[in-house]
Amino acid sequence: MTHEKLWGGRFSEPTDKFVEEFTASIDFDKRLYHQDIRGSIAHARMLGKQGIIPMEDVEKITAGLQEILRQIQGGQFKFSVALEDIHMNIEARLSEKIGEAGKRLHTGRSRNDQVALDIRLYLRDEIVEVSAYLDLLVDSLISQAEKNLGVIMPGYTHLQTAQPILFSHHMMAYVEMFSRDKGRMEDCLRRMNVLPLGAGALAGTTFPIDREHVAEILDFPEVTRNSLDSVSDRDFALEFMAASSILMMHLSRFSEELILWSTSEFKFVDLSDSFCTGSSIMPQKKNPDVPELVRGKTGRVYGNLMALLTVMKALPLAYNKDMQEDKEPLFDTIDTVKGSLKIFADMVGEMRINTGNMRAAAAKGFSTATDVADYLVRKGMPFRDAHEVVGKTVAYCLSNGKDLPDLTLGEWQGFSDKIGEDIFGCITLEASVNARSATGGTALERVKAEIARVKAGR
């Protein structure tokens, strides 16, 4: 393949070799080859339709690009750093193959709008994949919720025992979070799904192009409305990376819980051996490497977002070479999010729940204390007074090595004469859980209804 610069007419000296290597992006943007070829074929078809280039050339261009696609997919295409990027590598090879017709492909187009198109096409496909992986994770969560209906565990605030909840309720909390993550991805897709091709370098083109025709070929519902904006901004990539950062934050929180729950101190869950590793020195160890790595990779995704925000923060309109730095953080974010979601969906689907340990933990720490306060309120006591009474009751229990169910009726009535025999029915774990039956609560029937609602909407 010739390494002559396609933009070299103005220059009298060759590019310094290190400058070529420093400015080239082919090592990472070659993953855009399919989108670049698809966009070029659509552009050529439009040029032919508009009579800007002969239809005979369109046929040669299309056939040549399809052959290049097969060569790349078959590992037979040699990429050149001297040709800088995926666009120039493909165009140079095309011209080498088909001659003069290949040189007409770039009519009415700039690399500025070409790369904006390629990234949108690529990211559009990747968002669909990310959404599919989110669906798999939600399926795993729902499956665990259904298999473990009725399993009671402690709910926490400040990582201190707060109130008993259903394990299924906890799983469905993550279903809500990851469902919103999918919604953010869909919102991002809706805003980015516009065609930038036709914006030219920055001001449009003097040729009578038909942008709407290209949009139809490439399945874009509309075209961008300002040529400067079309090539200047990467907010669509930033929006995806911001949504990905929130998604990874949710995965990281879940990871932290699984790490804690799998310790010998909690023993709430057992992660499958296939998702854990051992120690090189301690033979007893079973380390939760997968959730630990996902937790760690969350910072990587945050860093990618900040990197691109920093690149874009002071750029004058329109295109600047700084924007070449958009791809590596974007691609890394895509790869990290997809990998994390896939492995998490599989891991959650295979984890085993230690129901006895969860229940035993829920029975400790005065988890039904709020139920006693609510009981007194229903007996006519103001809530703040009830709170005070129960606080003193808990202090008494701590001093005497007792828990709430251990108290006799006489001991209860020493704190309030409003307390009767019915107090004992209010402080069981099942009673506490099922009393919270308002929409969004942890009551068994409410959780069942939420599972059914989510499944019906999928």
UniProtKB/Swiss-Prot annotation:
Q: Can you name one GO molecular function term for this protein?
A: argininosuccinate lyase activity
- Can the keyword Mitochondrion be found in this entry's annotation? no
The keyword Amino-acid biosynthesis is annotated on this UniProt entry:
yes
Q: Where in the cell is it found?
A: Cytoplasm
Pfam families annotated for this entry? ASL_C2 (PF14698), Lyase_1 (PF00206)
Its domain of life? Answer: Bacteria
Q: What is its EC number?
A: 4.3.2.1
**Which reactions does this protein catalyse?**
2-(N(omega)-L-arginino)succinate = fumarate + L-arginine
In which pathway does this enzyme or protein participate? Amino-acid biosynthesis; L-arginine biosynthesis; L-arginine from L-ornithine and carbamoyl phosphate: step 3/3
Output the CDD domains linked to this UniProt entry.
Answer: Argininosuccinate_lyase
**GO cellular component annotations, sorted alphabetically?**
cytosol
Q: What class of enzyme is it?
A: lyase
Record's keyword terms, sorted: Amino-acid biosynthesis, Arginine biosynthesis, Cytoplasm, Lyase
GO BP terms in the entry:
arginine biosynthetic process via ornithine; L-arginine biosynthetic process
Protein family (similarity comment): Belongs to the lyase 1 family. Argininosuccinate lyase subfamily.
Q: Provide the protein name.
A: Argininosuccinate lyase
Which organism is this entry from?
A: Geobacter metallireducens (strain ATCC 53774 / DSM 7210 / GS-15)
Gene encoding this chain? argH
